[in-house]
Amino acid sequence: MLLSSSSHIKNLQTDYDVIIIGSGAGGLSAAVPLAQAGLKVLVCEQHEVPGGWTHSFALQGYRFSPGVHYIGDLHEGGFLRNVYEGLGVSDDLEFCELNPDGYDHILIGQDRFDFPKGKANLVSRLQKHFPHEAQGIAAYMDTVSSMMENLDSMRRIKSIGGALNTISKGAGLVRWTWRSGKDLIDRFVSDPLLRGILSGQSGDHGLPPSMVSSFVHAGITYHYFNGGYYPRGGGGAIPNAFVRAFKKAGGKLRLKTAVAHILLNRNKAVGVELADGSKLTTKYIISNADPEVTFGQLIGRNNLSKKLRRRLDRLQYSVSALSLFFAVDMDLRAAGFDSGNYWLYDHADIDKIYRLGLTDYILKNKIPSALFLTVTTLKDPGKMRKGHHTCEAFTFVGYNAFRKWAHEKSGERSADYQSLKDKIAENMLKALNKRFPGIRDSVVFKNLGTPLTNEHYIKATRGSLYGIAKTRRQVGPGAFPIRSEIEGLYLCGASTLSHGVAGATFTGLLAAKSILQCRISDMLKTGGRSLVIHPAEDLSYWQKKGK
């Protein structure tokens, strides 16, 4: 596919038309349509595998995916599904649908609530559990829908009349611009347990509900209204499918290729210098790295405006995590597990729990007060190894808790660092065993990642999970724009308009759209097969497939 609008790019002589720094969901979703439009595109990835947070890795034969646990918006007609099919990546990408009766299980103390697929089903179940809050539950969910649908309408505005119509519909939503997720919940319901349940997915943005933007909170709830999905083959299946489409269109990917500097001519980005000292020229650069890496390291503060320097100095990055990757010799389905995710909380004050997660409390030999657990071999039943289940558990921690070891080389850190990791892993397993007796004694393999692991492999500032923190002042008008103040330099990824696989993918499309000077729909015409969705919970289905 060659867009006529790409002709304006081809009259300058450079090594590449576009160089993309980083192969995360944002970088690759920009790379594919640009290459399909006939541009000469290079993606530089510092890691040995593509994907950024969407990559997978193997340890002792067990496959893990640190950043992809479930994805929404893959129902028929969903935007992300349309992207995968429109770019042709659906030819090499399949998903498994998580338990439609509970893609997220929220466990608070001794109480449990399962989030079912479908907004109406969710409202009905919540009202059944909390009949005294029935009216507030309905109003809350309707407000969540209105907030997201009006945001989507604003993106589609094509006329003054359309703008006025959207503004009139969304006038009542302006009140939420500077409000938090907690404000949104508390406006409609008062039951402490219900408030905790509605805050139960806060790990998808990593902030206390009182700190996160109401629109980010609402967006996560809305994103999963039509269920949760997991890529067959693990998170790495997503970048692998994008890379195949990218190379098919003539794009070039260089792994283990770190960019050391973005080259400027006055205030225009003209190329990159790689870590080996070689230089490449280009007409455009798209950075999938976070703002500190892009501006602070690759460009340098001295080359930035005072306004941008001040902004970098004030930035808050999202929380980091302790990531426990482990395998168990235990029949987890017989023990009551299914393909849904498990959010474990000691009590219903979710705000207090997430505030603790911003600190170093867990280093003081504490049992985590919150955990996220997922069993990837129940999400994707085709990936069992030796009859063992692979599991991933996460709890939040502030980066400063591990700062003292940051100067030590990865893989060669001191004995006290490894000893601390072992202690934390044991405490996480103790916490899981309290909820699920027997799981701790069934562990046959375990490995713990820390914020320093994230910093090394993902190049994430402060080991952040979601780029910049999605506070009220750092989203919307406060987010980093796709087009930077440096001419020819574009941004994508979690620190721009949105995070997560779907959010980052959207930002990559916006970057490509800006360069091609077209509409997003113009870039989604390659046409792949209809996305294949497998039912994770249908055991007879997997038996027939011989898996």
Each model region followed by its residue ranges:
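N-terminal glycine-rich phosphate/pyrophosphate-binding loop and immediately adjacent elements
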Residues: 6-146, 468-470
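A conserved FAD-binding loop/helix module that cradles the flavin
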Residues: 68, 494-515
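Rossmann-like flavin
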Residues: 109-212
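Helical element adjacent to the flavin cofactor pocket in flavoenzyme catalytic cores
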Residues: 219-273
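Mid-domain catalytic core of redox enzymes
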Residues: 230, 260-385
